[in-house]
């Protein structure tokens, strides 16, 4: 069975195709705000609507797949930017109506997790989901991904992006800040706001900007910012590993590309006897393949709707989503 997936939650519009649980391919384009500014939801939506037809035609042509071959259409229903989400939902509905096939609403964060499990072969991992919109440490229990710790305000990627934008390092901010940090040999103290198992990143970007204004060299501030942000996350991961005693950690989301973060998390995993598996770069950022894959899993378990019943949800918690397919992919394991 072929499932087509549409991703449009934020700055990236992407389409992917999955056949019987195997990713055939994906193609996408990213909206880059003019002047390195923040994402304007309406402008991102206009970008997505503009590029969607050509991406669909090009991907299907590359794969040698016809629209009539598609058995279901999945789309990222949330969380995300409302105008951008609606572009993907409208395309999914239109295709489903034309083809007479079901529509599968997919949670963006769950899709990041599932494509990471697919690509790394992880079975029952502790999940570290880190991106521009997510900072969550979670694990499967009783039909859902349960959250052990999360950001109380902005996501780790968003905080670093905001700082990068303000100091002129451009977008995306995480690789730019890490590159800037490479020339620094020292760090300066930063607050580490960890509340129980939860994190607060909003103040880190503000503190970093204050240091720049005081004349602290930019590379030193960059290194201090990323080290603090990553060690805060590592602290929560370590506590979750101690509690769950899981033997696998899967790192998913766009920030998973960070070389320094991989080093820190692998050190934590080694201390607790857990193997840290990082999603490959091709599936780290927002992509249509993860939506198609999760849509395929959901469809097989009867989780789908009609075009008339398909909606978007700008706010949608990860731990409110049922994942009835989890045991299908990991039949022999222990669950917390």
From Swiss-Prot:
Pfam families: TsaD. Its EC number is 2.3.1.234. GO terms for cellular component: cytoplasm; EKC/KEOPS complex. It comes from the Archaea. One of its GO terms (biological process) is tRNA threonylcarbamoyladenosine modification. It catalyses: L-threonylcarbamoyladenylate + adenosine(37) in tRNA = N(6)-L-threonylcarbamoyladenosine(37) in tRNA + AMP + H(+). Binds 1 Fe(2+) ion per subunit. Substrate binds at residues 129-133, 161, 178, 258. Fe cation binds at residues 108, 112, 286. Its cofactor is Fe(2+). It is found in: Cytoplasm. Gene3D superfamilies: 3.30.420.40. NCBIfam families: arch_KAE1, gcp_kae1. Required for the formation of a threonylcarbamoyl group on adenosine at position 37 (t(6)A37) in tRNAs that read codons beginning with adenine. Is probably involved in the transfer of the threonylcarbamoyl moiety of threonylcarbamoyl-AMP (TC-AMP) to the N6 group of A37. Belongs to the KAE1 / TsaD family. This is tRNA N6-adenosine threonylcarbamoyltransferase. It comes from Pyrobaculum neutrophilum (strain DSM 2338 / JCM 9278 / NBRC 100436 / V24Sta).
